[in-house]
Amino acid sequence: MIDIAAVAGCDYVKFQKRNPNICVPEHQKNVIRDTPWGKMTYLDYKYKVEFGKEEYDEINRYCKEKGIEWSASPWDMDSLEFLNQYDLPYIKIPSAMLTNEELIIAARNTGKKVILSTGMSTWREIETANNWLIHGGEGPKQ
C-alpha cells in the first residue's frame, strides 16, 4: 500500500489501530471462526491480524524512506496512547467512534490535527463530536 501510494503521488497512507480485547464484543470473543490460519476464536483472529509495535515501527521507517507520511485511526484509548509514540501529522477518528467523547477529547489533547469521520452519523452526533473537539467537553451542551 505504501509503495502504491508513493508512486501515485499521495501525501499520506492511513492505517487503523485497535485493542481487540476492548473492541471485540464479549459475546463474540470465543466464537470459533474459519480463518486463513485455521479455526480459532474471533478474539485470537483479531489479535493475529492486528499490527503491533514491530509492524508500526516498520511502517514508520518505510514511510520515511519512501517520503510519504502516515497516520492511523485509533479505535480505543489504548490505541491512541500507542500511536502517540509516533510523530503522526494527524489523528483520524473512525466514524464508528464519533460518539466516544473520551477518545475525541483525548485526541484533541494530543495537540495534533484531528479529522472526524462522519459516515452513517446523524447531524446531532456530528455537532456533538465537533463541540467536544472544539471545546474539549467544556463547551456548549446540546
What label would you give each PLM region?
Residues 13-15, 70-72, 89-93, 114-116, ...:
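Hydrophobic faces of well-ordered beta-strands that scaffold small-molecule active sites
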Residues 35-96, 100:
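Active-site beta->alpha loop and helix N-cap motifs at the rims of alpha/beta catalytic domains
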